[in-house]
Amino acid sequence: MARPARFSDDDILDGAASALAEHGPRATIADVAAAIGGPTGSIYHRFASRDEVFARLWLRSIGRFHAGLLTAYGLPDPREAVAASARHVSAFCRDDPLAARSMLLHRQSTLATEGPVGVRDEAAHINDDIDAAMDDLLLRRFPDPTPHHRELLSMGTRLAPYGIVRPFIGGEVPAWVDDAAAASAQAIVGLGD
């Protein structure tokens, strides 16, 4: 009978997030092993390489972030959905600082084409549900949308909030950042009215 695994994938990814917070993007598998209190062999039993560990950490962090963003995009009132999606960006980064830092590890397009082979497909499609939810919000917010409306919605609910919160990642994200992100989102998207 095989011995049960001492560490789950999530235990290892939690260790990777802790190692990243302590050692930065050059964290090693030895740093991850130290964070979980186990041998490096336990990690290599589950993951083929350091690159895969940190790619999987990025994917998990993005997935957790997307869960709240999908909820915000789906709010019935499209104007409230715009504000809530922007607030979610900073609130998530405040509530889960390790995941926020982990989300800075990779660019989706690069991971999808140059990342470990086993993660490329997942990375290529990680934004599919978010893109579909944003398209739905676009139609609710602008009944006859143009490409310019889509640009405004993307800028207001994704790019601007990311830019507002990014300087705070790795430290304390002040509560006022939520309101700043929401106000900027409403103003940017409102340019399409």
Language-model segments: residues:
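N-terminal intrinsically disordered/low-complexity leader segments
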Residues: 1-7, 18, 112, 193
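Helix-turn-helix
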Residues: 11, 15, 22-52, 56
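Alpha-helical DNA-contacting segments of helix-turn-helix folds
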Residues: 54-61, 69, 103
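Amphipathic alpha-helical segments used for helix-helix packing
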Residues: 95-118, 166-170
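C-terminal peripheral helix-coil segments that are non-catalytic and often amphipathic
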Residues: 128-140, 144, 155-193
